[in-house]
Amino acid sequence: MAEYDLTTKIAHFLDRHLVFPLLEFLSVKEIYNEHELLHGKLDLLSDTNMVDFAMDVYRNLFPDKEIPNSLREKRTTVVAQLKQLQSETEPIVKVFEDPETTRQMQSTRDGRMLFDYLADKHGFRQEYLDTLYRYAKFQYECGNYSGAAEYLYFFRVLVPATDRNALNSLWGKLASEILMQNWEAAMEDLTRLRETIDNNTVSSPLQSLQQRTWLIHWSLFVFFNHPKGRDNIIELFLYQPQYLNAIQTMCPHILRYLTTAVITNKDVRKRRQVLKDLVKVIQQESYTYKDPITEFVECLYVNFDFDSAQKKLRECEAVLVNDFFLVACLEDFIENARLFIFETFCRIHQCISIGMLADKLNMTPEEAERWIVNLIRNARLDAKIDSKLGHVVMGNNAISPYQQVIEKTKSLSFRSQMLAMNIEKKQSNANRNETPNWAAQDAGFY
C-alpha cells in the first residue's frame, strides 16, 4: 500500500531520531524493499552518534563485509567526547543531585531566583548552563534519551525564555519524551512548546508558519498515543486558525490524521458538529490532497454516494493498517464509519430493509441486525426492528428550532476571540525568531 504511504512527506518535518520508529514500522509491514529501508537507516545514522546502531545496520545490509574503519574511528571519537563531557558536567550534576537543591527546584517557580540560589550555595555559573545543554544534546545524539530529558529539564528550569538555546531545548525535551513513550510528559512539553511559539511576538510570519508546521508533525506521536489526544488534535488542527492555516498552506496531508481523529472521537454530539466543520475543510483542500479517508467523508457527507462510501471504507482499512500513527485506530474507525453510513442513510429513509443496510455496511444480514440491536440497546439509536418484515423503523428525532440555533451559534464566540487574538499578534509581529534546530535537524528533513 505504498501508494498512500506518507512517511516520506512526514519525515521532512521530523528530527531524524523520530524517523527511526517509522522506518521500523515499515520494515515490519514489508511495504518497501528491506534493503532500501536499511540504506535509509544507515543514511539517517550517519549524522548521529549512535555508532553501535549504525554498525548493526551495516552488518545486516552487508553481511559479507567488514565494518568500515570510518565507523570504528567515529566510535572511538564519540567515546572520547562523551568522557570529556562527563568530566565537565560531573560537578554540575552533583549540584542537582543534592536533596536541598531538588526541594528548591520543586518549590521555586522563578528561574532567576533559582539560579541566584545555586550561585550563592554552590558557586553555579552561567557557563555551566551551556555545558549542561551541550551534554544533553550529546546524550540525545547518542540515543540516551532519558539522560537528555533529565538534563534538558534542569536547563529549562534555569534559563530565561530569551536564552539562545531555550527554544531548541524545548524541541529536544519533547523529542526525548516521545522516543521514551512518556506520553503524559510529552503532552506537557508539547503544550509548553506550543505556548512558546504562539506567544513569540518577534518572529516573522514565515518563521511562525515553519515552527507550527514542525509542531503539527511532531504532535502526531503524542495525539495518537495520549488518552485525550484525539480531542486535543481536533481542537488544535481544526479550531486554531493559525494551525489550520499551516495545514492548508504547508501540509494538507495532515487532513488524514485530523479526519481519523474526528471519525474515532467518542463524544457523539461533539463529533456531529465537528464533522460539519471538517467537511468544509476537506472540500476546500480536495484539489491539493485526498486519500481514501478524506474521500470517504466526501462521498458520505457531500455527495451522499453510499456505494462509493462503502468502497472507500474498504480502502480506508488498508490505509489505516499501514499507517504508523493510525494502525491502533482501525477498529474504532471501522465501527464509527459504519455508524456514520447508517445515520446518514437513516436521515434519508424512515424505513430501511436490513438486507439493504447489510449491503451498505459490508456485513451479513445477521451481523447487521445484531449490530443495530446493540446500537438501540446502548441508546445510540432511536429505532425499532420489525423482525418479521426485516425492517428497521426510525424514531422521530426532530431537533427543536431553539436547539438548532444553539448548535449553529455556540462556536461563534470562541472563533471571534481567536480572530481578535490573531489580529493583535499580527499587528505586533517583528523580525526575529529561531527555527527549530534540535540535534540532527538539517536540510534533509526540513
From Swiss-Prot:
SMART domains: eIF3_N, PINT. GO terms for cellular component: eukaryotic 43S preinitiation complex; eukaryotic 48S preinitiation complex; eukaryotic translation initiation factor 3 complex; eukaryotic translation initiation factor 3 complex, eIF3e; nucleus. Residues 222-399 form the PCI domain. One of its GO terms (molecular function) is translation initiation factor activity. InterPro entries: eIF3e, eIF3e_N, PCI_dom, WH_DNA-bd_sf. Pfam families: eIF3_N, EIF3E_C, PCI. The keyword Flavoprotein does not apply. It is found in: Cytoplasm; Nucleus. Keywords: Cytoplasm, Initiation factor, Nucleus, Protein biosynthesis. Disruption phenotype: Reduced melanisation 2 in embryos 2 days post-fertilization (dpf), misplaced pigment cells in the tail at 3 dpf, and abnormal jaw morphogenesis at 4 dpf and 5 dpf. PROSITE patterns: PCI (PS50250). It comes from the Eukaryota. Its main location: cytoplasm. GO terms for biological process: formation of cytoplasmic translation initiation complex; translational initiation. Residues 428-438 have a biased composition (Polar residues). Component of the eukaryotic translation initiation factor 3 (eIF-3) complex, which is involved in protein synthesis of a specialized repertoire of mRNAs and, together with other initiation factors, stimulates binding of mRNA and methionyl-tRNAi to the 40S ribosome. The eIF-3 complex specifically targets and initiates translation of a subset of mRNAs involved in cell proliferation. HAMAP family: eIF3e (MF_03004). Component of the eukaryotic translation initiation factor 3 (eIF-3) complex, which is composed of 13 subunits: eif3a, eif3b, eif3c, eif3d, eif3e, eif3f, eif3g, eif3h, eif3i, eif3j, eif3k, eif3l and eif3m. Belongs to the eIF-3 subunit E family. This is Eukaryotic translation initiation factor 3 subunit E-A.
